[in-house]
Curated annotation (Swiss-Prot):
Superkingdom, taxonomy of origin: Bacteria
HAMAP family documented for this protein: MsrB
Keyword tags: Metal-binding, Oxidoreductase, Zinc
Domain MsrB: 9-131
Biological-process GO terms, alphabetical: protein repair; response to oxidative stress
One GO location term (cellular component): cytoplasm
GO molecular function: peptide-methionine (R)-S-oxide reductase activity; zinc ion binding
Reaction(s) this enzyme catalyzes, per UniProt: L-methionyl-[protein] + [thioredoxin]-disulfide + H2O = L-methionyl-(R)-S-oxide-[protein] + [thioredoxin]-dithiol
Identification of the protein by name: Peptide methionine sulfoxide reductase MsrB
Binding positions (Zn(2+)): C48, C51, C97, C100
Gene name, Swiss-Prot/TrEMBL: msrB
Family: Belongs to the MsrB Met sulfoxide reductase family.
NCBIfam families (UniProt xref): peptide-methionine (R)-S-oxide reductase MsrB (TIGR00357)
Group of enzyme by EC: oxidoreductase
Organism in which the protein naturally occurs: Pectobacterium atrosepticum (strain SCRI 1043 / ATCC BAA-672) (Erwinia carotovora subsp. atroseptica)
Length: 139
C-alpha cells in the first residue's frame, strides 16, 4: 500500500473551494460537524467531487455520531481504493476514489451490524445527486 497524493480536479472544471482542494488533493480532513452533506437525508447517490464517479448510495448512509457523513458500504468493490495510513501516529485505512484517486476519508471496523464497516467520508470530497429532481449539491 502506498500514500501517494491525489492530483485530480473536478471534471466540470469548476474551481474547488480551499477546503475541497485541501481534502481531496492534500489528504486533509474537514472539521467535524461542519460538512454540508452531513445531515442530508434526501434519496440519491454520493459521487466523487473530482470525477463524478458514484461512490455511495443514500440508503447506505447512517448517523454514526462521528461528525462526518458515514456509510456502511460503497456502491461497488471498485468504487473506492484502500491504502494504509500511518499519519498522526495512528494506523488507519484511507479511502480514495477508485477512479481518480481523490482522498475521501477513512474506513473503520466499527460500523453497523450489516457490514461492520464505517466509511467516514469528508463532505468536501463528495457531490450528492438527488434521485427525484437531479439537483447536484457539492460538499
Amino acid at each position: 500500500m502506498t500514500n501517494d497524493s491525489a492530483s485530480h480536479t473536478p471534471s466540470d472544471n469548476t474551481e474547488m473551494t480551499e477546503m475541497q482542494r485541501y481534502v481531496t488533493q492534500q489528504r486533509g480532513t474537514e472539521p467535524a460537524f461542519s460538512g454540508k452533506l452531513l445531515h442530508n437525508k434526501r434519496t440519491g447517490a454520493y459521487h466523487c467531487l473530482c470525477c463524478q464517479a458514484p461512490l455511495f448510495y443514500s440508503d447506505s448512509k447512517y448517523d454514526s455520531g462521528c461528525g462526518w457523513p458515514s456509510f456502511d458500504q460503497p456502491v461497488s468493490s471498485e468504487a473506492v481504493r484502500y491504502l494504509e495510513d500511518e499519519s498522526h501516529n495512528m494506523r488507519r485505512i484511507e479511502i480514495r476514489c477508485g477512479q481518480c484517486d481523490a482522498h475521501l476519508g477513512h474506513v473503520f471496523p466499527d460500523g453497523p451490524k450489516t457490514t461492520g464497516e464505517r466509511y467516514c467520508v469528508n463532505s468536501a470530497s463528495l457531490s450528492f445527486i438527488d434521485d427525484v429532481d437531479g439537483e447536484r449539491v457539492d460538499g
